[in-house]
Amino acid sequence: MNLHVISPGPLTTVQDAGRTGYAARGFRTCGAADGYAMRTANLLAGNPQAAGAAVLEMTLQGGKYQFDGGAVFALAGADMPAALDGRPVPAYTPLLARAGQVLAIGAARSGLRGYLAVFGGG
């Protein structure tokens, strides 16, 4: 399953749990800014063994994404209104998208960073 980016938010990045053990070599851990929200989205999307799996981290503004196959996904973090094919969908809930459906995520009403996790997120 691929997730096609139709239009990203201006500060949308791919994040994961970061890299540990490299500080002595000058590398910071980095990773998602809100690790709790990232892990929550991953767990809801069905990634419990990989709660640090890659997610989309959206700062202030979401974006528009199309699923090319069926997928379980979840949103967590900032309160960003979202709709799947024009129908509102809640955050903090496992959701199912079918092939061709478009997920539109709006601007944050509160909070700063929202997270989109998809089952199997690498």
Where are these regions (language model features)?
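Conserved "landmark" site that anchors the functional core of diverse proteins
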Residues: 1-122
